[in-house]
């Protein structure tokens, strides 16, 4: 029986108001998690020693009861982390600032044109307004950038922009074009978003120049990734081009965390779908130990899941290290 689970990510809705080229949630997402279902989770979260709940989606601020959900969880002493596109953050900044201990905003361009090309909306200025508004209410957001062919040349400019808008931190990950299950995908997914062979030396040069020019931002953790981790992103894109192997992945995320989809399905992580017998809305703790989930975790531990070999967001933690870093304002290693 699973005894501890410090971190839970809850997809409160499948709906999304972005139109990202990297994701299909906006095309077909309809389901909202009910407040009643989330209320039934609380005894399991308490027994599992859960300390941090991340609200995600879809776009969590589209849920008509997002504030009630956050208040319910917070009333049980849980620390809350909001993962958002930022489109409606300015509108809800006051309540979000009061309810969430940390906020991460996805931002994939440093100008209106790039943002619109990737996110499908002319909303760049609105997102920056939301970041500034949240910071003014006491929770300076982190910014997360999905690097891809349309924006990788802006790598240093992202850091400058994050500083300018008052972000707490900025992190980077590669666009995931290798996993057919990621980000609500239902159709074949194009790999045209990835860097091409001719882009690789340009990206490498940017990382090399940033090591010197942004040395303090690396040292302070304002840039969450080290130069070495940015080079792993380069290696990932190089592997997609057939030039070398994918970077080795060390991850035990299913051992200290779980993801609950809006329909109640429990997943071992963001990128691997959960088994049919793992339903959090029935008994979350039992779902974690269902036959299907136990078999899936065993496959992951044994390295038999192809998705793990090309993962763009792996994590390795001990339970004690997760507990120590659960105060999110001091947890850059959790990529918030």
What is the predicted function of each stretch?
Residues 19, 49-51, 99, 139, ...:
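Short loop/turn motifs at secondary-structure junctions
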Residues 19, 23, 63, 92, ...:
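Residues that scaffold the ATP/ADP-binding catalytic core of kinase and kinase-like folds
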Residues 15, 19, 23-26, 254, ...:
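Cys/His-rich metal-chelating microdomains
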Residues 15, 30, 60, 87, ...:
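Residue-level marker for beta-strand->alpha-helix junctions and adjacent short loops that shape enzyme
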Residues 33, 99, 106-108, 113-252, ...:
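Radical SAM enzyme [4Fe-4S]-AdoMet core and its adjacent flexible, acidic
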Residues 1-95, 102, 195, 203, ...:
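Conserved alpha-helical substructure of the radical SAM core
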Residues 2-4, 243-252, 259, 263-336:
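Flexible mid-to-C-terminal extensions adjoining Fe-S/redox cofactors in radical SAM and related proteins
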